Amino acid sequence: MASALSYVSKFKSFVILFVTPLLLLPLVILMPAKFVRCAYVIILMAIYWCTEVIPLAVTSLMPVLLFPLFQILDSRQVCVQYMKDTNMLFLGGLIVAVAVERWNLHKRIALRTLLWVGAKPARLMLGFMGVTALLSMWISNTATTAMMVPIVEAILQQMEATSAATEAGLELVDKGKAKELPGSQVIFEGPTLGQQEDQERKRLCKAMTLCICYAASIGGTATLTGTGPNVVLLGQMNELFPDSKDLVNFASWFAFAFPNMLVMLLFAWLWLQFVYMRFNFKKSWGCGLESKKNEKAALKVLQEEYRKLGPLSFAEINVLICFFLLVILWFSRDPGFMPGWLTVAWVEGETKYVSDATVAIFVATLLFIVPSQKPKFNFRSQTEEERKTPFYPPPLLDWKVTQEKVPWGIVLLLGGGFALAKGSEASGLSVWMGKQMEPLHAVPPAAITLILSLLVAVFTECTSNVATTTLFLPIFASMSRSIGLNPLYIMLPCTLSASFAFMLPVATPPNAIVFTYGHLKVADMVKTGVIMNIIGVFCVFLAVNTWGRAIFDLDHFPDWANVTHIET
């Protein structure tokens, strides 16, 4: 039996890849309707995405092949979905993130903030979480985690080395004093105290490493380009509800998601404090207590790492200027509560010529123009070697670095999702699914939101968060229309819940990076992550039912969601 299972496991990928399409064929043969053929493609891609028998990006290209073959969409209609406005927005954000990483600006910001926060355990953890979340808003969660965890590890090792040296000194003193004590007065407390301190150190290591991957996942939810699911939502809104008129943009998303991120970050910090530090605030926060040697050692590590960076370079200053320019232009384009710069010359009737993608590509282009060194204008006093060098220094980015660092697979993954949404609309699958869900009209909207958010949070533990939102959001949009509910009331919380992969090392790259350092067991991640998932879902539920209602007018079924207004 065991050998048979081993044999099956060995050929699992082969079986899934070739047998799955054959098993699903009866669907198409028995019910040759167009929407059934579209469902066949979606189910097949969902299985391939969940099992990853072929790369996610390659699976995302399947609509280009299957939709024309099944006469769902012609090739031109499918291919155009892979380079839409939303894809360009995400691509521009990724290029800016590459520039920040290339010149180590993210590391400087992180170390400077941690030095300001201090080295007391609770404050240090809060500092790590705040910095990680802040960076994860703008650069990828994986890159943020990969940069932060080595800093955490260096601090933990230095603290452990200092504690070990202190214990060795105390042991020598105790041995000297033990000779003076009568036998009846010898109390064997040394090993117990040592074990207790060792357990405390292990708990601290677990807390410090977990806080990084949690903060990276939470931080990415705060901005529209912070993580893939957010961009999927924007693309699905533009595809399924073209009359929504830029309702979801950088400013409106930030107004909704950033406060939610802060609330979640606070609860995550409190939960980690409770599980691993037992809420000993006097000891871990350090109120009125003198710094211990291991805390001074941690501070020394941070100071040394910051010293290695040297003074702020010309390139870092220019990247910082470009970054602030990007954020300011995003926020001020169409803030909602006042006319933005968009209205000056780029609005004609109902048409808005400039989007957030335009801004992202503009700043991304600047990074290939702005110099990384100061240009030298003093030609008379130049040496022979200086005369040979080009007058204009190299730019902040070149295409070789950009090509290597940008995760192009995610761009294709987004395109695949938009192609599926287009195919669902064109084939009538969206309308059919909506009709099947009409009985949900009797269920309270709040209950629907809560249940579906929990479903997505569990599903994303096993599947890519982008693939999860790509599969679920069109279904939820159809369901919302069929029961007369504002689609964003369902789509917003489910999009955020797709980023709550806290339970398993394989759930998301930040979890995997943290797990490889050896401080955590799978049981530790599951035990802590289950409650984190619940915290995340309820925080989002709170956000949607409070300030989310005001920002997106979630109490009313909007005209832009009416099926008669949607082009098919």
From Swiss-Prot:
Q: What is the effect of changing residue 227 to M?
A: In DEE25; loss of function in citrate transport; no effect on localization to plasma membrane
- Provide the GO biological process annotations: alpha-ketoglutarate transport; cellular response to lithium ion; citrate transport; fumarate transport; oxaloacetate transport; succinate transport; transmembrane transport
Known regulation of its activity is: Inhibited by (R)-2-(4-(tert-butyl)phenethyl)-2-hydroxysuccinic acid (also known as PF-06649298). Stimulated by Li(+) in the presence of Na(+), moreover changes stoichiometry from 4:1 to 2:1 Na(+):citrate.
Q: Does the keyword Iron apply?
A: no
Q: What is the effect of changing residue 219 to R?
A: In DEE25; loss of function in citrate transport; loss of localization to plasma membrane
Top-level taxon of origin: Eukaryota
Please list the tissues where expression of this protein has been recorded. Answer: Expressed most predominantly in the liver, with moderate expression detectable in the brain and testis.
Q: How does it sit in the membrane?
A: Multi-pass membrane protein
The transmembrane residues are 13-33, 53-73, 80-100, 124-144, 215-235, 252-272, 311-331, 353-373, 406-426, 439-459, 487-507, 528-548
Main location per UniProt? membrane
- Cite the GO molecular-function annotations of the record: citrate transmembrane transporter activity; identical protein binding; organic acid:sodium symporter activity; sodium:dicarboxylate symporter activity; succinate transmembrane transporter activity
Keywords in UniProt for this one?
Amelogenesis imperfecta, Cell membrane, Disease variant, Epilepsy, Glycoprotein, Ion transport, Membrane, Sodium, Sodium transport, Symport, Transmembrane, Transmembrane helix, Transport
Alphabetical GO CC annotations of the entry are: cytosol; nucleoplasm; plasma membrane
Note the InterPro entries from the entry.
Na/sul_symport_CS, SLC13A/DASS
Query: PANTHER family this protein is in?
Result: NA(+)_CITRATE COTRANSPORTER (PTHR10283:SF109), SOLUTE CARRIER FAMILY 13 MEMBER (PTHR10283)
Q: What is this protein called?
A: Na(+)/citrate cotransporter
